[in-house]
């Protein structure tokens, strides 16, 4: 008889974590291209308009110029009707639908009016299609593939709310043709997926195509009056999510942080606007910036938020100990501040471990944190140059002057017992320490004298270790107050299972972070929402964040 071989502990541990990761996880975003539906007002039209549009769509397959001609004439007729009757919804729908199909035809036929005017014969004489010149960096249409937003079917956990804005123009997804090679120096995304709105203005036989930014422009000049600019805020985010596949990086960046070191950076989600307040979002353990999609998608549907805020995110390998991730963030803030000066106090929103990082942005420890960790001052310790540099950067720092408000969402500021639970210990043991931090950790372990009840390790602490309530750093940082200059807000999840708000078991919790760990007595506000640990995606929490952002705008005037 053959006995089954014993499964190595590593394999069991990996299986446990992977099982927890994949169970019950819906797809973040699923996108597929489809034939666009006629707007309801056009579908209901039984006359010549719908027939002419259908004929134009059929014609453009084999005769792009003829199809463009028909679509331009329909767009021009609708534009003229809107000049005299701007409330005519059928004319608006006809115009927007025609412009979307014109952009799609240009792409399919590989025609580029931004390179040279297109002369197009029509039943009403020759039409000349040109493109508006745009000198802004990155706004050269030749850099992008343009797909009308109404040609996408969008589903998924993170994009179930479809945020659109009615108005003039065809919402378009601009997809970068090549990798963005200036991403690091411009703090932008490595691959561009951005929502623009196509507008065609007619002057006699000339039709001028322009791509407007709906995050920068609320209204446009159209046929002699200001008109709201149409927008689709959801489809570009969904396309980006599907192409980026963030889910495959969540576990990988936790277990192998050194491999993904270059992903520790701030990135802008839109062109920099010095007149808008920055909202910097910071994700948590085993997560990516994709986790903020439901929040950003909803916030962009609010005109007040669009007009006054711009969104940046800080991404990092979540296997790093969070004091080190905070040190990298401070470096990034220094760098981005030189290129894009932050003129208004920014709002930082941190979820889970991202909240712990956020806390370090508004703390002034001086050398106090160092002394609490090592029981000696910095000049009393003999440390190698690189080790000393990393430890000083992580433990001796000032609060950030550009931060004007912080929102903590499900943040384990005093740790989580899950980090000391058997599953947390298994997860911690699977994280491969970066070589540089391993060396630093070995030297630091020899110098730190632990108390009897403190977390003991024979290796460098990682992110999970840094979330243990009995971790020395966690204990030390909680003896140092946050800056009274910066108002803070707390949003905590509650699964509705009852429990105590103090450490008396059973405790009130979101399933990961207990209330006693996230509560801040001096917070300007505290909101408990009916949620598990993903409180930042909860509708109640999103509503509360919207309220706080509007409060920040009002108080910053």
Where are the predicted features?
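Short, flexible hinge/linker loops that cap or flank conserved catalytic cores
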Residues: 271-274, 340, 400, 482
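Serine-dependent carboxylesterase/thioesterase catalytic core
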Residues: 32, 55, 59, 66, ...
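Bacterial N-terminal signal peptides
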Residues: 11-23
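Short amphipathic alpha-helix adjacent to the substrate-entry channel of hydrolases
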Residues: 293-309
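Bacterial N-terminal signal peptides that target proteins for export
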Residues: 2-14
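Short, solvent-exposed loop/turn segments at secondary-structure junctions
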Residues: 286-287, 318-319, 367, 412-414, ...
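Flexible, membrane-associating and regulatory peripheral segments of lipid-active enzymes
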Residues: 25-279, 288-294, 310, 554-557
């Amino acid at each position: 008889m053959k006995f089954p071989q014993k499964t190595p502990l590593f394999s069991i541990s990996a299986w446990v974590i992977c099982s927890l990761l994949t169970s019950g996880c819906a797809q973040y975003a699923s996108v597929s291209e489809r034939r666009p539906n006629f707007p309801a007002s056009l579908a209901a039209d039984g006359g010549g308009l719908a027939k002419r549009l259908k004929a134009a769509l059929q014609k453009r397959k084999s005769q792009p110029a003829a199809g463009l001609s028909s679509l331009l004439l329909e767009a021009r007729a609708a534009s003229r009707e809107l000049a005299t009757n701007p409330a005519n919804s059928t004319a608006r729908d006809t115009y927007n639908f025609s412009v979307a199909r014109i952009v799609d035809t240009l792409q399919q036929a590989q025609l580029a009016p931004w390179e040279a005017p297109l002369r197009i014969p029509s039943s009403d004489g020759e039409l000349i299609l040109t493109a508006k010149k745009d000198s802004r960096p990155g706004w050269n249409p030749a850099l992008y593939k343009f797909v009308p937003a109404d040609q996408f079917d969008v589903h998924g956990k993170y994009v179930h709310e479809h945020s659109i804005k009615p108005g003039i123009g065809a919402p378009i997804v601009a997809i970068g043709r090549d990798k963005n090679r200036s991403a690091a120096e411009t703090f932008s995304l490595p691959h561009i997926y951005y929502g623009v709105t196509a507008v065609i203005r007619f002057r006699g036989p000339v039709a001028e195509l322009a791509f407007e930014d709906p995050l920068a422009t609320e209204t446009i000049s159209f046929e002699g009056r200001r008109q709201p600019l149409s927008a689709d805020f959801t489809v570009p985010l969904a396309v980006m999510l599907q192409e980026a596949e963030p889910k495959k990086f969540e576990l990988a960046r936790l277990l192998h942080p050194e491999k993904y070191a270059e992903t520790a950076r701030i990135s802008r989600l839109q062109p920099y606007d010095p007149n808008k307040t920055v909202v910097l979002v910071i994700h948590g353990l085993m997560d990516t910036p994709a986790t903020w999609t439901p929040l950003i998608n909803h916030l962009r549907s609010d005109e007040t938020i669009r007009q006054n805020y711009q969104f940046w995110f800080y991404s990092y390998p979540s296997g790093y100990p969070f004091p080190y991730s905070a040190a990298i963030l401070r470096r990034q803030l220094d760098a981005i501040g030189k290129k894009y000066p932050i003129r208004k106090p920014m709002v930082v929103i941190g979820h889970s471990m991202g909240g712990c990082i956020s806390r370090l942005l508004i703390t002034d420890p001086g050398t106090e944190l160092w002394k609490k960790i090592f029981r000696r001052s910095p000049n009393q310790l003999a440390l190698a140059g690189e080790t000393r540099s990393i430890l000083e950067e992580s433990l001796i720092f000032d609060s950030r002057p550009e931060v004007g408000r912080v929102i903590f969402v499900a943040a384990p500021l005093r740790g989580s017992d899950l980090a000391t639970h058997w599953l947390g210990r298994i997860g911690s043991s699977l994280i491969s320490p970066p070589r540089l931090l391993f060396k630093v950790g070995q030297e630091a372990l020899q110098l730190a004298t632990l108390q009897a009840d403190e977390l003991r390790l024979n290796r460098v602490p990682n992110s999970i270790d840094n979330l243990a309530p009995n971790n020395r750093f966690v204990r030390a940082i909680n003896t140092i107050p946050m800056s009274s200059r910066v108002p803070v807000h707390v949003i905590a999840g509650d699964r509705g299972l009852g429990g105590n708000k103090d450490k008396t078991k059973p405790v009130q919790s979101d399933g990961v972070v207990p209330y006693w760990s996230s509560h801040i007595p001096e917070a300007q506000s505290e909101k408990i929402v009916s949620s598990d640990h993903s409180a930042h995606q909860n509708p109640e929490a999103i509503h509360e964040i919207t309220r706080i952002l509007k409060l920040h705008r009002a108080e910053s005037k």
